[in-house]
């Protein structure tokens, strides 16, 4: 049995006076009974966000959102002959071995009349006071009616760092919101907020609702001053701003500003994006910025070929590529740095015999990334393509089409690489460590191959935004040694320690 978790880390960009780093972790938590005939899986989605409280005694807090899939729980009959489930939750916030705050509680599901067709979700929201600092957040979830030998546990580092000056809270994607006078963990500044379970917007969802807070603009800029708040959507892959999704509003300075808004995304193509809040002062300097990562599925949207037809290929560098097989090959190499829409469109384009359209598309691709020197941008990129083809080519794929090649072309060369090809009991693996990855910090990629002779290393885990994450990745590396344990301990997220097992140490402490 294989297990896959989804892990996104959303980080705010460090901008001058805005030094606060915010991380959102989205986990697909799975725990099961081993070797049970009827396996019941606890499926939960967890995210968290950071907020500030201004005033004479400023403070900070983390807000956690745990959403449970009701159909994944084990139900028991209560005294009223109805059914409910119970989940035990433990959340620790630690610095070293010192626990700075914690939550230990049980959550009861909504009451069900019967268990035949249970569906839907329910959410638990909690708040934890945490002063500025770096913490390890440890989460343990257990179905009280379906206990395992070891409940599923996961850890992640969070950084709370609200400066005294201008700063923006984390951005929450909202399922819905409404005005409310109630006081509860789901209300904030006069609104009842229901966060999104996951940052995924299918074609049936055409509105992106969000909430954020802006702090201390009056302290930094002065009372009765103004600043610009830009709200826009940009491509995750290259940061390019989408023209139809850029909004500007002049704001008055105050202690705390509540931002709650909607954006129509009916015509937003499929892909990975950031929703960005960016504040600028009178000198047009960026004084605050934060981002919300989300995914959009909109299969009805396609690139309009008429937008390319105006390009005169005789006047641009791509017109000099007259061999159709060559330009097909060149377009294929763009996949690692393309948006989803570009990948889908180009995959269909290269199936045709339309050389001119390929030339027009190729130029447009590079002009959108470097309008001044598109040819140089392509030549620099192609030099890297040749490098990865030389280093990462496998039996069946050119280097750019392999997982290592894609990561290298998308993010650049890693700062450190651990290569472990001969560790006893382990499949050959590599761990790549990036000190910085755009606005992200300290991100890692784990690759593994079943046969070193093929040079075909597959990505099995990363903690970077939008990348595959599997918190049981060590079980993949060591499963030929711990095969029986791997099959039995399906609720485990790591192999037992033994002599010669170094993967986790290499991951935590890159050489």
Identify the function of each model-found stretch.
Residues 31, 53-56, 448-450:
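Short beta-strand micro-motifs enriched in acidic
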Residues 19-24:
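Sec-dependent signal peptide recognition
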Residues 13-16:
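Charged/polar low-complexity intrinsically disordered segments
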Residues 240, 252-256, 266-268, 295-299, ...:
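Residues within mature, well-folded domains
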Residues 37-272, 278-324, 489-511:
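Intrinsically disordered, low-complexity terminal regions enriched in Ser/Thr/Pro/Gly
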Residues 27-35:
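Hydrophobic h-region of N-terminal signal peptides that target proteins for export
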